[in-house]
Amino acid sequence: MLILTRRVGETLMVGDDVTVTVLGVKGNQVRIGVNAPKEVAVHREEIYQRIQREKSAQAGESDHQDD
């Protein structure tokens, strides 16, 4: 894992098309802004995991529909 230190207002680049900017720090919360092309999905981890679970459940349902 790459660990970087950034201050409020500073940005890091992910590849050529994605920027992540530190917008603010309040207590133990950090607000970040992400600029990415439309074709790049950006989700909080818990939302991403929920999407993956739903996809798996749907795939399981479609497997059973063929029976």
Curated annotation (Swiss-Prot):
* Domain of life (superkingdom): Bacteria
Molecular functions per Gene Ontology: mRNA 5'-UTR binding
Note the subunit structure.
Homodimer; the beta-strands of each monomer intercalate to form a hydrophobic core, while the alpha-helices form wings that extend away from the core.
Q: What is this protein called?
A: Translational regulator CsrA
Q: Which HAMAP family match?
A: CsrA
Function statement? A key translational regulator that binds mRNA to regulate translation initiation and/or mRNA stability. Mediates global changes in gene expression, shifting from rapid growth to stress survival by linking envelope stress, the stringent response and the catabolite repression systems. Usually binds in the 5'-UTR; binding at or near the Shine-Dalgarno sequence prevents ribosome-binding, repressing translation, binding elsewhere in the 5'-UTR can activate translation and/or stabilize the mRNA. Its function is antagonized by small RNA(s).
Paired cysteines (S-S): none
**PANTHER family from the UniProt entry:** CARBON STORAGE REGULATOR
What is one process in the GO biological process aspect for this record?
Answer: positive regulation of translational initiation
Extract the Pfam families matched here.
CsrA
Q: Which Gene Ontology terms of cellular component type are present? A: cytosol
List UniProt keywords, sorted A-Z.
Activator, Cytoplasm, Repressor, RNA-binding, Translation regulation
Family note: Belongs to the CsrA/RsmA family.
